[in-house]
Amino acid sequence: LKRVGLNRDHMSRFPHEFSGGQKQRIGIARALAVEPEFVICDEPISALDVSIQAQVLNMLKELQEEMGLTYLFIAHDLSVVKYISDRVIVMYLGTMVEFADSEELYAHPLHPYTQVLLSSIPVADPRLVREKKRIMVKGEIPSPINPKDCCRFAERCPYATEECRAKLPELREVTPGHFVACHMVK
């Protein structure tokens, strides 16, 4: 309990007496009780206030260093992903479209979907907002049920060709440690 910022008094409380952040800390403590090497964190901060999110993220980083943990961190908040991750996998409709070291992926996104995602990260500085190019996609997200045997992003991609609509691209290493599944990236 101490590792996750709780004390002995918390052991005698009922579930309804805990805040969202405390409940999340309890969940993390339960996961750590078996001394894992690998922890899956599926949206671990999505329902928390921003201040509590920062506390939980910092705690996760400290626990990672202290216990030598490896995380599979699943999240939609790309700023959080950048903060917590060493390597990032971007997926679209259940298919991996890009994989690289965090710094490399954020500095040089290659897949059009990754570019769209990164262009959507909010910028706090109004001067930078005017300079930032936001990439918009058109169309509806296709059904993930029985997907076509082609690029999953082709229907919405501004660069899609007939090859994209006819053939599923393979995940290829285009620079050392940077993999992308896109026919347009050579």
Each predicted region: which residue ranges?
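Interfacial catalytic loop of ABC nucleotide-binding domains
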Residues: S12-F14, K132
